Amino acid sequence: MEEIKNLDYGWRNGMAKNITFIVTKDCQLACKYCYLVGKNTQERMSWEVAKQAIDYLLSQEQLFREEAVVWDFIGGEPFLEIELIDRICDYLKIEMYRKNHHWFNAYRFSFSTNGINYHTEKVQNFIKKNHSHLSIGITIDGTRRKHDLNRIWKTSDTAPLKEKGSYDDVVKNIPLWLSQFPSAGTKVTISSADIPYIKESVLHLYELGIQEVNINCVFEDVWKEGDDKLFEKQLIDLADAIIDEDLYREHVCSFFSEAIGKPLDRENDNRNWCGAGNMLSVDAAGNLYPCTRFALYSLRSKKPWIIGNVWDGIDQNKLRPFLTLDRWTQSTEQCFGCEVASGCAWCQGENYDAAATPTIYQRATAICKMHKARVRANNYYWNKLFHKLQVEQDMEELERQKRKSNKVIC
């Protein structure tokens, strides 16, 4: 039976400590679906704050016991601050070595970038210096028309006719990126307007040489009546293309997973979906957050959830509510009884922002219909794929028996 390419679940299977530096809140783009509603050009992290953050974090070895760490850099667009990032990474390496820290040589520097500055000399020098410890994902949303529908250049002129897409500025850097990180995957975001372009976009990314496409629907309440049906149709058409063209052998799309679409087991399926509360994020002011989605620039209507700062450390009482978070303490009765609940995702920050009160224990369910549509298409995908593989296996066995029976016995 042919091998099926599986999704990469991340370095150390996603079990490393994740610490995020919000180095800037500025970006060249103004993506329409971006959850960072408070981007600005003023809030840039200083070296003094970054150094203090590192000194504090590395002094708390008893508090942070994970065997490995991912040092994550985001914005805005992180590579706008490549000089600061380079200095941070140099200092981290020196201090982890000097302290004989258990994270020394058990770390990654991680970036999610819009790709526009990827080819520049300073970014490339940084990559050469740190390549063996780097994870870089360039966001390209698919075909030109899908990408340029949402990922547009920032402008003071809001007239639709003045919008300028960023596809050409990103796609030119994809060959260089893949030559340096051949197994890297991209992240694709789906909102209501670009549902019709899902199939063509995933296939286009495969054609560009990207083998892993991590794709998800936005968690915000943006969906319209009938979106779920159109979504299901696009995924079924995509499933047909992937299977009929044997793309499943070398490519993967995260929409299709054997693990989703089953009833929940209360004992075994009770983990929180994301790492909010286990991860840590620090901003330009030196404030600490349980996740970047709880910083002010990520929130539409709620106050930021600050759990400490880099001078005084973490206030465990402010972090405590996150320690008891699980699926059952925040989900609705409908979620409990859903027959296809497994794999239905949520974002803890969106739960908080969309809740009727300032709580993290009220799950946002805007993607409910979209998840169910995904499950229906996912069932179609696996049924068709396993049927094809079984037929191929049967044919191989038949040919083997034929060859055996045709041998001349002397």
Where are these regions (language model features)?
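Flexible, acidic/Gly-rich N-terminal and inter-domain linker regions that tether
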Residues: M1-K17, L29-Y33, N406-C410
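Radical SAM enzyme core and accessory elements
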Residues: M1-N6, Q330-C410
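Radical SAM/AdoMet-radical enzyme domain recognition
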Residues: L58-S59, L63-D72, E81-C217
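Flexible glycine/acidic-rich beta-alpha junction loops that bind and position SAM and/or redox cofactors
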Residues: R145-N150, E212-L230, H251-R266, A295-P304
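C-terminal accessory region of radical SAM enzymes
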Residues: K233-P263, R293-A345
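Canonical Radical SAM [4Fe-4S] cluster-binding loop centered on the CxxxCxxC motif
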Residues: N13-V49
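Local cysteine-cluster metal-coordination motifs and their immediate loop/turn environment
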Residues: D26-L36, P290-R293, E333-E350
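Short, small/polar residue-rich loop motifs at catalytic or cofactor-binding pockets
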Residues: W273-G277
